[in-house]
Amino acid sequence: MSIVTPYIPREYLALRINYCKQQLAELPNVVRSERNIRGEKKTVLVSESHCYSLNSTSGRKLAEVIQRRELLSCKLSRLEGLWNSAFRGLPPADIEPRKIIRSFVDSTGESVIIDGKFFESLKHNSNPYYPEHKTHYYNGTYYRSAAEADIARFYTEQGIPFKYEPEIWISGMSRPIYSDFVILIRELDLCKFHEHFGLKNSADYTRKTSTTYNNYSGAGLLPELDVFYTYDVDNIPFDIRTLHTKLNSVIYDSLFGVDITL
C-alpha cells in the first residue's frame, strides 16, 4: 500500500506564519526577574522599566502575556518547521494578515459583513430539519455523513473556528438556509461558507445543489471566493487533501484576486 503524499497549502501556511509573527510583535516585552524587596528575594515581572508583583492585577495580566508569547512561539516554530520541510526561502512578506471586507445581502435587504462579529452571531448546529439523518458523531456534534465528520475533525485539528449548519437569512429567501459549515479565517477576519455535497447521482440532490449555488450567488456571495464546495465520490472515502487545496485557493483569491481589503 503506497503512502499518500500530504498536500501543504503554501499561501495559507505563509499567512499563518506571518500572522503569528504579527501577534508576537504586538505583545509587550515582559521578563521575569529576581528582586530584593525588603530584604527578601521575590520574583517580579518587568515591563517597560516597571516592576509588578505576581499577585497584583497588572502582574497577573503580564503573566498571561508571557504564557501567550510562549504558546505563539511554539506554534510559530511548528509552522516554520512545516514550511522549511516543503519550501525554499522565507514565507512571502506580501502574504500578510489584514482585514478583508466581504458581505452579502440578507433577507431584509441589508448588507452583512462576513467577519468575526458575524461568525460569533451564528449558532452552531441550528438546523431543525431531519435530525434523524445525523448519525456520525464527533466532538459533541452529530453530522450527516462520515465526510462531514471528517471535515469537522480537520477544522478542529487545524485550529480553524467553524459553525456547523448555522441559521442564515439571505436575500431572496422566505426561510433561512443552513450552510454545512461557516469557517472563520482569523488571519483575515473573514468568513467562508463551505458546502459539502453527496449523493451526486441523485436527480433531486442535483437540483438542490443547483438551487444552493444560485441562492448564494443571488445574495452576492461569489462561488470559489466566498463559498467553496466539496463533493463525495461514489465508493471512495473523502480525500481531506481536497479541503487543503480549496482553502488555499479561496485564501489566495481573497488576498490577490480582487481589491477588497480594508
Language-model-derived ranges and their functions:
Residues 155-156, 213-217:
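Class I S-adenosyl-L-methionine
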Residues 1-118:
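Nuclease-adjacent, charged terminal/linker segments that flank catalytic cores
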Residues 168-176, 202-204, 233-239:
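Acidic-and-aromatic substrate-binding clefts and catalytic sites of carbohydrate-active enzymes
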Residues 135, 178, 182-212:
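Short beta-strand-loop-alpha-helix junction that forms the active-site gateway
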Residues 141-143, 156, 161-187:
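Active-site metal-binding core of divalent-cation-utilizing nuclease and nuclease-like domains
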Residues 218-262:
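Basic, glycine-rich
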Residues 97-160:
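Solvent-exposed, charged helical/coil patches
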Residues 5-8, 67, 139-143, 200-204:
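Conserved aromatic-histidine-acidic binding/catalytic patches
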